[in-house]
Each structure stands twice: as C-alpha cells, then as structure tokens.
Design a protein with these regions (language model features):
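Short, conserved beta-strand/beta-arch hydrophobic-aromatic motifs that form part
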Residues: 1
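His/Glu-based metal-binding/catalytic segments typifying zinc-dependent metallopeptidases
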Residues: 161-225
Length: 274
C-alpha cells in the first residue's frame, strides 16, 4: 500500500496523476489483500495513457525525504479509517474470521510498521514483485486490439531473473463467534460473516464469487422477501451491504447493516444461513 502511493511520484517530483489529467484521463489505484491495481479511465489518447501506466509501474523515483513525508500522509489515512465506524466494523469482523493471520492486520499497516518503512524496503519490494510475469493488463471499451498488441510488441523486452513466491496456507484458528466495538454512532451496526472452508483454484474463483453474490443477494438483498419484511417493520434500512471475497487461499462473505435491533437480526441472519 505504501509503495502504491510512492509509485505516483515521477522523477521530476511531479505527481503522476497530474500527467494523466493533462491527457484527459482519470487515474487511481488501490491495494487489496492480494494485489495492487493501477487504473485509468479515458475517452482519448489510449496509447499515451498506456505509456504513463507503463512508466508508473516500470520504475521508482522516490527519495528518503519523500518517503518521510508519505509516512505522515499514510498515518493520517490510517487515523481516518480508525474513526470510520464502517471500516472498523469490517476489519474487526475480518480479524475474528481469521485470527492471528495477515488478514487480521489492516492493509494500511500499524502506526509502528508505517513509521519503520524505509526507501530500501520499498525498492526491494518493487524489484522483487513489479515484473511483467506478475502483472495482468485489462482493457475495457471500444478498443482496437491489434493496435494495442502492436504497441506492446514494440516495447523493449527485458531479461528478468525469475522470482518464485512461496504461498503458505493460512494457519486457521477457530473463528471468534461474537465480539463488539464501542464508538459514537447514530445507529447500532451489525456484521454477520462466514469463513469459507477448503481451497478454490484461481480458475474457479471468478465463478464461485459470482455464485456466492447471487446466493446471498437472493437470500438477503433488497428484492428478497426477508429484506422487505425487515425493512417494512423498521428493523433494517437501505444500509445493508454485501462483501464477497474469493481467493485461492481464502474466501469469506460479510453482511453489514445499521439496525436498532442488532441482537435479534444477528440471530435471524445466522439462522437463515444455517
């Protein structure tokens, strides 16, 4: 996540987002549990924007001074999430599903881990992981595929040392069944979650993700009989949200909602899932 921030820094200290903006593109990035994604949206100058994207993930230009500045920025981002009840609820629920694993740790990091990050850590991470073999490019829209293929065929192909990442199984501990947080909120919040069992191949994960979303939407979504009854009786509002994560190493479903009757709804939702 820290490296994601710093890759937007160009050699002349200009922010890469400004370069995308000059080409009429909107750019962004995010880091999830398993990947970092860099994206842009544009109606013109596709190849020029691809040049910027290649530059973005192709080299690093940060300094010790800029890393120190970024530490303060990310500490502020972390504090912002700590003050967000929905974010706190989600990550606390995840920590209960996967106690004592990396999934129980906030992606942004802790105050201590952020303060300890150095230029050498970031460059080592970049050197080992930011290689074409670890990257996928997705283009969506009215695009001439041949033009894009020709564009990449002209790019210089570098000979890179292969690096194998050993993916270890998560050391699964028993799920923590119930927990609570205390924050100042206008309405109590509830999360009901399920941890999947067994492993799913990468090829199966997309289909499995869609199936889970369809199943839980039919069971609890806005058009379901269950939701309509709870909504009409005032026990549930439109805040109901579904989060599905499917990966070859883990998969889970988390339902979050605002409700004046968290204990009653927790019982009803858990009973329906069983």
């Amino acid at each position: 996540h820290f490296l994601e921030h710093k890759l937007f820094e160009r050699e002349n200290s200009e922010d890469m987002m400004a370069a995308f903006t000059r080409l009429g593109a909107d750019s962004n990035a995010f880091t999830s549990f398993t990947k970092t994604s860099y994206l842009f949206s544009t109606i013109d100058h596709l190849l020029e924007n691809l040049d910027l994207l290649n530059e973005l993930v192709g080299d690093v230009h940060f300094t010790e001074e800029s890393v120190l500045r970024e530490q303060d920025i990310i500490q502020q981002e972390r504090e912002m999430y700590q003050d967000d009840p929905d974010s706190r609820l989600f990550f606390a629920t995840l920590a209960n599903l996967y106690p004592d694993t990396p999934l129980a740790t906030d992606i942004v990091g802790s105050e201590k881990s952020i303060s300890e990050i150095q230029v050498s850590n970031l460059k080592e991470n970049f050197t080992e992981f930011y290689k074409p073999v670890n990257m996928s490019l997705f283009l969506v829209g009215n695009i001439d595929v041949k033009v894009v293929e020709e564009y990449f065929s002209k790019k210089e192909k570098k000979t890179l040392e292969q690096f194998t990442v050993t993916k270890e199984k998560l050391p699964l501990q028993p799920v923590k069944q119930t927990d609570s947080l205390r924050m100042e909120v206008s309405s109590p919040k509830l999360a009901v979650a399920i941890r999947g069992t067994g492993q799913i191949t990468e090829e199966e994960s997309y289909r499995y993700n869609i199936l889970l979303k369809l199943l839980f939407t039919m069971m609890f979504g806005w058009t379901s009989d269950r939701f309509q009854k709870l909504y009409e009786t005032g026990k549930l509002d439109a805040s109901l949200s579904l989060e599905v994560e499917v990966n070859s190493r883990f998969h889970f479903v988390i339902l979050t909602m605002d409700t004046k009757e968290p204990v009653s709804l927790s019982h009803q939702f858990r009973k329906a899932i069983r």
